[in-house]
Regions:
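Non-ligating segments of multi-cofactor redox enzymes
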Residues: 1-192
Length: 192
């Protein structure tokens, strides 16, 4: 669906996991959910967030694949590893700064969100965005998002590495990029 963009707004996730169930039903996923669903421990409450593949402009997963099994289409969608090329080496899993790809042992293959390519390529919305009741995951025209207080960004910094993506994250007004301090994150994990 050209002219449409994918938006993720973690602040709107209500934890219903409708996206997870809908993703399992997508024809190309063989009953596997490609949604990364996370519980976030906040100081006073537990939050939830659903994440899809961010479809990087320069996908690290594809760059590190020794079998050249991960392809990016002209529309920017980064596809799951192609069988029989995928050797399930996990290089892509380890390299992705977002932690999105997963090796599915029963298929010996890397699988990840492909933005429901079987649907979006024929003008339909991805399954997860179709069922999300709170619009934490949405696939809409940019003008439909423009009225919201939050602003979309598709620029992420992981330390010194700048990553631009096809999927946008809704952020507070004035945020130009999402900066992830990896050293602070690792310090918290090792000293918890």
């Amino acid at each position: 669906m050209y002219g449409y963009e994918f938006y993720v707004d973690p602040s709107r996730c209500i934890g219903c996991q409708s996206c997870v169930k809908a993703c399992e039903e997508c024809d190309t996923h063989r009953g596997q959910s490609m949604i990364n669903f996370d519980f976030i421990d906040r100081s006073e409450t537990i939050g939830t967030a659903a994440y899809v593949c961010w479809h990087c402009d320069e996908p690290t997963c594809a760059q590190v694949c020794p079998a050249d099994a991960i392809k990016k289409g002209e529309d920017g969608v980064v596809m799951s590893a192609l069988k029989p090329r995928c050797i399930a080496c996990s290089n892509c899993v380890l390299a992705c700064p977002f932690g999105i790809p997963k090796i599915v042992p029963e298929y010996e293959q890397m699988m990840k969100c492909d933005m429901c390519y079987d649907r979006t390529s024929v003008g339909k919305r991805p399954m997860c965005a179709t069922v999300c009741p709170s619009q934490a995951l949405s696939y809409v025209r940019p003008e439909e998002i423009a009225h919201r207080r939050e602003k979309p960004t598709n620029v992420f910094y992981f330390g010194e590495q700048k990553i631009t993506t096809q999927v946008y994250m809704m952020t507070p007004p004035g945020t130009e990029a999402v900066v992830v301090d990896i050293t602070e994150f690792m310090w918290e994990k090792t000293n918890a």
